[in-house]
Amino acid sequence: MTNIRKTHPLMKIVNNAFIDLPAPSNISSWWNFGSLLGICLILQILTGLFLAMHYTSDTTTAFSSVTHICRDVNYGWIIRYMHANGASMFFICLFMHVGRGLYYGSYTFLETWNIGVILLFAMMATAFMGYVLPWGQMSFWGATVITNLLSAIPYIGTNLVEWIWGGFSVDKATLTRFFAFHFILPFIITALAMVHLLFLHETGSNNPTGIWSDSDKTPFHPYYTIKDILGALLLILALMLLVLFAPDLLGDPDNYAPANPLNTAPHIKPEWYFLFAYAILRSIPNKLGGVLALILSILILVLMPALHTSKQRSMMFRPISQCIFWILVADLLTLTWIGGQPVEHPYIIIGQLASIMYFLLSLVLMPMASTIENNLLKW
């Protein structure tokens, strides 16, 4: 008798994706982050659902409803902090996942990579709108500053901003629509993640060497299911350490003050995972230029396959490219630090230099290093 998992129409899909899937036999722990992102997404949808049961998206009661969740709802505080810090864990996994793709040349799977970039944009939009919902000072001023960037678009900018606001300032209409979008986007992300997996399973996974691995495959279950469970346990451990011991470590104290349109927050800054892009935005004195640099800082990922000049796919055997990659990582950490600092000397010049370095490393030095390595191979 044939096993039900191989005959049942639904079970067959699950079987081919998670059980009998042929996987390369040498993929390292850097390949764990895909499954960890899936776990984060499920966790965020579940905690978000329970928060939405008690949250009210009205400017007069939003802040109070979040306080009510933390004080009066059974285990509301843990649900709230799991959701807030879950977003941080989500982005840590995401940055690791993208970094792995860049290092090992996974961007040569064009469809998978491009869907991944769309997923990144969708996640950034979701996180931004979620940050507005508690209606604290940083929520309000963050929403005002970031939505205002659209006014840099020539001719239609001002109308576009007022259309998004639903009025002449960030107000009740803005909060209500942000809540609606924040609720629907994770389900769109789930659908996109399924398409991401669909395209990945058309080609099969990459591996650390970047070499075609059809001649050496192993079943996904039990080898990689066990490996994924270990990763999941470590993720949950890290998340719960954050939630139970330092829930406000990554948050902003200003967001514990209710939103006040008459009083500007002293240092307007987004959550830590957007600081690198925020630093690039601030480093250009021109508004439109800053917005373009901000968008390009993420869109640069789409250009990666076109900028790949090496004869080898992975960076595993390319020491010059490895050096440039790790300098890029250090540069991104520098930008993250600068994004959280006030706009004054010496932070302004450091931010500008780090922004120039970011684009220089990605667009110029990376392809140059690959070409040099190609020539060294001939010796």
Curated annotation (Swiss-Prot):
Q: How does it assemble?
A: The cytochrome bc1 complex contains 11 subunits: 3 respiratory subunits (MT-CYB, CYC1 and UQCRFS1), 2 core proteins (UQCRC1 and UQCRC2) and 6 low-molecular weight proteins (UQCRH/QCR6, UQCRB/QCR7, UQCRQ/QCR8, UQCR10/QCR9, UQCR11/QCR10 and a cleavage product of UQCRFS1). This cytochrome bc1 complex then forms a dimer.
State what this protein does: Component of the ubiquinol-cytochrome c reductase complex (complex III or cytochrome b-c1 complex) that is part of the mitochondrial respiratory chain. The b-c1 complex mediates electron transfer from ubiquinol to cytochrome c. Contributes to the generation of a proton gradient across the mitochondrial membrane that is then used for ATP synthesis.
Q: Where does a ubiquinone bind?
A: H201
**Primary gene name:** MT-CYB
Membrane topology is:
Multi-pass membrane protein
Protein name in UniProt: Cytochrome b
Q: Name one GO biological process term.
A: mitochondrial electron transport, ubiquinol to cytochrome c
**Note in the entry:** Heme 1 (or BL or b562) is low-potential and absorbs at about 562 nm, and heme 2 (or BH or b566) is high-potential and absorbs at about 566 nm.
